[in-house]
Amino acid sequence: MNVGILHPGDMGVTVGLCLQRCGHEVSWLSRDRSEAPRARAEAFTDYDDLTTLCGQSDVIFSVCPPDAAYSVAQQVHQANFSGTFVDANAVAPSTAEKIAALFDDNYVDGGIIGPPARQPGSTRLYLCGERALSVAAMLEGADLQAIVMQGNTSAASALKMAYAAYTKGSSALLLAVNGLAEAAGVTETLQQEWQLSQPGLMQRSEKTALATSRKAWRFAGEMREIAKTFEAHGLPGQFHSGAAQLYELMASLKTLPPASLSEVVQVLLQASAEPTPDIESDSLRD
């Protein structure tokens, strides 16, 4: 089948490569993209026009930052795409339902759990919707394991929100705790107490800083979607709204090498002392 990928970052590229290895023709939209994504997507057919890409594609996978998910879906809808639209983004079920309304039965809800799919068993793509089984069949034997869920049209998004609420939410909390300790002048004593009562937490803090520093700008939108999900079910969403704010403070680390814990803490404290900028997703250019 002919598959379009919008817009392949680290995760989207591996989704495309998995589909390609399963025998599908994969294309992407190169318009307005920088050299880095062009290099990542060099194995795919390059289109400069979305309408042309949509006309050539049987299936489109949307794999982009959450802030851009609905906009990308609207653009595909406006290009009169008539095939299967797979939204594999980290969005709230309410956002997924809005996207589903654009495509009716041609919509498949997806949620990716795990790192970029470069080895078997590492990454799952949960799917639900009328065409979920046919999409899963496209990835049979791939490093990206497709799992079809029962439930409503946004069940995969709900699962992703619940999963990331802990993984990325707890990462934000841990970084915030380290920032608080530094600001209050108790870092050394806190670390000593951790060695006594929470062994391994210092090492986890260091690993969390390295793993999140370059991706924090992207996580901010995901935290806002998670907050919406909690609130939609009558649960407090303020924790994840706070996590979004913390990740936004780290946005300046996006283009730098992975940062150490001390570097992240200094960025947090410096950024928190300045007026908060109006950060918009630059997802379709990176």
Give the location of each predicted region:
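NAD(P)-dependent dehydrogenase/reductase Rossmann-like domain
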Residues: 248-286
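Rossmann-fold dinucleotide-binding core
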Residues: 91-168
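Short, well-ordered alpha-helix to beta-strand connector turns
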Residues: 23, 43, 56-57, 82, ...
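NAD(P)+-binding Rossmann beta1-loop-alpha1 motif at the extreme N-terminus of oxidoreductases
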Residues: 1-59
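Helical "substrate-binding/catalytic lid" subdomain
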Residues: 159-261
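Rossmann-fold NAD(P) dinucleotide-binding segment
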Residues: 50-107
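Glycine- and other small-residue-rich loops at beta-strand/loop junctions that grip anionic moieties
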Residues: 8, 62, 88-89, 150-151, ...
